[in-house]
From Swiss-Prot:
Binding site for Ca(2+): D156
Cellular location(s): Mitochondrion; Membrane
Protein's organism: Saccharomyces cerevisiae (strain AWRI1631)
Primary localisation category: mitochondrion
One annotated GO molecular function: endonuclease activity
Family assignment from sequence similarity: Belongs to the LCL3 family.
The name this protein goes by in its record: Probable endonuclease LCL3
Topology class, membrane: Single-pass membrane protein
Domain TNase-like: 53-261
Amino acid sequence: MREGDSNSKKSADVAVLSITLTGSTLTLIYTYKRYLTQFKRTNDIPRRIFRKHWLYGKVTSVGDGDNFHFFHMPGGIRGGWGWLRPVPQMIKNDSTAEKLVGDSRNMRFFNFNWITHGRSTKSKIQKAKSQFLKLNVPYKNRKNLPTIPIRLCGIDAPERAHFGNPAQPFGNEALIWLQNRILGKKVWVKPLSIDQYNRCVARVSYWDWFGGWKDLSLEMLKDGLAVVYEGKVNTEFDDREDKYRYYEFLARSRKKGLWIQNKFETPGEYKKRI
């Protein structure tokens, strides 16, 4: 082979190798940006994600009965989480659920009330509350992390005490239930919209070893710890409103959770009143 032909072949090989490396690099960059970039706040989530895609991550804090903080872990283990990229470790909780909401104990009633008709209703309410207060809250909330605030779609949980206003009945119990169910665990989040508090309104799904995949909003409705969302702004159901209303009806007819009360003020009514 002549020297000129040899040089031409080498140049062609170098060009092919260069194009291949450039293409591979661009593909890796594209893949990382599209599938492995961590979203650290609500505004990081691209519009293309909303209503179409699910995000995987860990619940690091639960501050209320219908919202929590979500640490995004794109790609899971295959995305390097736990071996290349650090995952926040939870701190074990040494307090019981009742201590976490200490004022709930003060809502107990005097023993001599059994002679009154009201005692029966109060006993039923207290019994309903106690089953939630006994739930295990395994971890403490982790704060000051790059997390996305998540608001559960389609439901409203009873309000807890805020800004000097008293808590609604079952507000603390809803918080404990949610902490027991998801705090420190991995969940899937489907972003739907952003509310006025810059929270990501989302449908949330988690795995239960005894029941498979669970819709978190639906499970709260089933246990009578939330009502179907009544507001006209940021109303999101992800095409599950009829199902949510059906299970709310079942919980109400069976007097589960907050529905055991004879007189009940919805979270929406409570917020309007105060």
